Amino acid sequence: MKQSKVNVSFEFFPPKNEEAISSLWQNINRLEPLKPRFISVTYGAGGSTRENTHNLVKQIKKKTDLQPAAHLTCINSTKKEIELIANDYWSSGIRHIVALRGDPPKNISSAKGDFKYATDLISFLRKKYDFEITVSAYPEIHPDSDSIEQEYDILKKKIDLGATKAITQFFFDVEYYFKFIDGAVKRGIKIPIIPGILPVTNCKRTIEFAKKMNCKMPIKLKNMF
């Protein structure tokens, strides 16, 4: 029986120092033979981290045969700032953006800039560029959402504005993913929804992150830590 090919992508944090840069490129070179569908690079809140993201995405495009996807958050950003970044990516041959809101201040109404939600960013990008736009999805409901129905409504709005695929928040129980996919199909959502998988390298940090993002960790798994 012929096995179907499983396509994967990898997500990296931008390196913060020379040692991390060396380690990152070792990993990229090690993973390149697997021919991932794309390599994405996260986007931090600080200015220096953002520059690291921009530089790394462009270096991946220049030095490898991999297809990089640049995370781009919009909270506290102006249209001019986003336009400059998008223009730079486009002129560098980058054609894939992971469009996200980013972590807002505690009071979302106090956020500065021209964007409050990822949908604002998607709309802005789609009107000006022909990027492939990937967005987030939340099988276990985003901490700011009221219900799973709201999650589907937001995802459908992202698609209507130009999103071409989605990546889910990480999860530990695959049933949440399957249930989310079933619900998406019933609601006419047809874009690919890629499962987010988090390698556990730091148990304490993983548990804290899971709690923050409303990801339920099975007791059996938690006891292993």
Located regions from the model:
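Hydrophobic faces of well-ordered beta-strands that scaffold small-molecule active sites
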Residues: V6-P14, R37-V41, P68-L72, I97-A99, ...
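Active-site mouth loops of central-metabolism enzymes
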Residues: N7-S23, P68-K80, E132-Q150, F225
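Active-site pocket-lining/capping segments in soluble small-molecule metabolic enzymes
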Residues: E19, G113, Y117-Y138, G188-F225
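Active-site-adjacent beta->alpha loops and helix N-cap segments on the catalytic face
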Residues: A20-I21, G47-Q59, T78-L84, D103-L125, ...
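Active-site glycine-rich loop that binds ribose-phosphate moieties when present
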Residues: D144-A166, Y176
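Conserved N-terminal beta1-alpha1 strand-loop-helix module at the mouth
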Residues: M1-V41
